Amino acid sequence: MITVKPIEDNIRKEQLLSRYHCSAADSTILVMKDGVCELGYAAIDLIQGKLLIRNIFLTNGSAQELNAENKIYIDFLMRAAASYGANHGAYQMENCVEELHSFFVSKGFVLEHGICTIPISKIVHVCNPHHT
């Protein structure tokens, strides 16, 4: 079963966040695994209500090689990042990986002036905890 969870190794987390210039308090690395086998990760930053995807890395090769398997993994990481962002107060999502803009546009993101964005509510349903 494929899972995506925030990284547990704090040393690796800090190294990767530094590499991708993630600096917000709620920034993290979301690690995708199939059982114990790591498939990849997304480096995300949360700044002023925006979730920024700083990088996506796949262990089977380049995330920019958009074969069918990689598209599934990138989509999985994108949706997990949106869920993480929604749970941490983000309302907007932005892809910062220029090579993946066309993929994200195919998922509903809007590309304007080199910035690829989408409201998080277009990806995940945000429930009102006070609504019964």
Which residues make up each language-model segment?
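A conserved beta-strand-loop-helix scaffold within acyl/acetyltransferase catalytic domains
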Residues: S18-L51, N55-T59
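Short amphipathic alpha-helix that is part of the acyltransferase structural core
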Residues: M1-A24, H130-T132
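A short linear-motif detector with a strong N-terminal bias
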Residues: E8-I11, S23, L30-V36, K71-D75
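Conserved acetyl-CoA-binding loop-helix of GNAT-fold acetyltransferases
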Residues: L66-S83
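Short phosphate-engaging motifs
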Residues: R12, G49, L100
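Conserved acetyl-CoA binding element of GNAT-fold acetyltransferases
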Residues: G49-E69, T117-S121
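Conserved GNAT acetyl-CoA-binding A-motif
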Residues: S83-V97
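Terminal substrate-recognition subdomain of acyl/acetyltransferases
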Residues: D34-D45, E94-T132
